[in-house]
C-alpha cells in the first residue's frame, strides 16, 4: 500500500490517542520507519502490522481499528488529499458510489503502482443501492465498511 495509508493510521492514532501511543504501536509492530512518504509504495505487511499493533496497544479489536481508519479516511484523509476528486464524483452518495470506479482510475494516475479494490453497484433504487467490494487484499472489509 502507499504511504498515505500508513500516514493515515499514524495521524488517526496521534490525534486521537497521542504520540506516546503511536510510538508504542510502532515499537510493537517492529516497524523501523520514522515517517511515511505518501507517494511511496510500502509492503502491505507494514500496514497490517500497524493495524494489529494498534489493536493490541489500544485494547480494541482489529475490526474496531479498521472501522476507525475507514471513518478517518473519509473525514480527514479524503477531504484533505482528494477533495476535488471526491466532489467530482457526484452530487450525492449514490452518484459517488456509481462513479467510484472512475474515482479509482483517477487515483491510479497519481499512484501508478496502486492495486485498488473493485467496486460494483447493483440494484440501484430510490432509497437503496447494493455495493459489491472485491480486493486482492484480505481482511480490509471493516475498513471499507466504514468509508
Features from the language model and the residues they span:
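Electropositive phosphate-/nucleotide-binding environments in soluble metabolic enzymes
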Residues: 3, 7, 15, 19, ...
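A generic structural signal for short
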Residues: 10-11, 39-40, 136-137
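Amphipathic interaction/junction segments at domain boundaries or subunit interfaces
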Residues: 47-137, 141
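Extended Gly/Ser/Thr-rich low-complexity repeat segments
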Residues: 143-147
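A short, structure-level motif marking secondary-structure boundaries and short turns
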Residues: 6-7, 35-37, 131-134
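Alpha-helix N-cap/helix-initiation sites
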Residues: 2, 19-22, 40, 44, ...
Amino acid at each position: 500500500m502507499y504511504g498515505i495509508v500508513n500516514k493515515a493510521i499514524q495521524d488517526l492514532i496521534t490525534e486521537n490517542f497521542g504520540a506516546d501511543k503511536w510510538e508504542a504501536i510502532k515499537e510493537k509492530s517492529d516497524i523501523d520507519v520514522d515517517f511515511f512518504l505518501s507517494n511511496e509504495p510500502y509492503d502491505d505487511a507494514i500496514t497490517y502490522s500497524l493495524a494489529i499493533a494498534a489493536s493490541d496497544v489500544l485494547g480494541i479489536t482489529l475490526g474496531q481499528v479498521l472501522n476507525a481508519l475507514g471513518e478517518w479516511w473519509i473525514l480527514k484523509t479524503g477531504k484533505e488529499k482528494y477533495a476535488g476528486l471526491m466532489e467530482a464524483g457526484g452530487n450525492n452518495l449514490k452518484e459517488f458510489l456509481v462513479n467510484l470506479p472512475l474515482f479509482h482510475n483517477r487515483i491510479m494516475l497519481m499512484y501508478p503502482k496502486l492495486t485498488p479494490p473493485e467496486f460494483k453497484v447493483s440494484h440501484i433504487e430510490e432509497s437503496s443501492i447494493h455495493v459489491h467490494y472485491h480486493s486482492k487484499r484480505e481482511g480490509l472489509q471493516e475498513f471499507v465498511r466504514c468509508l
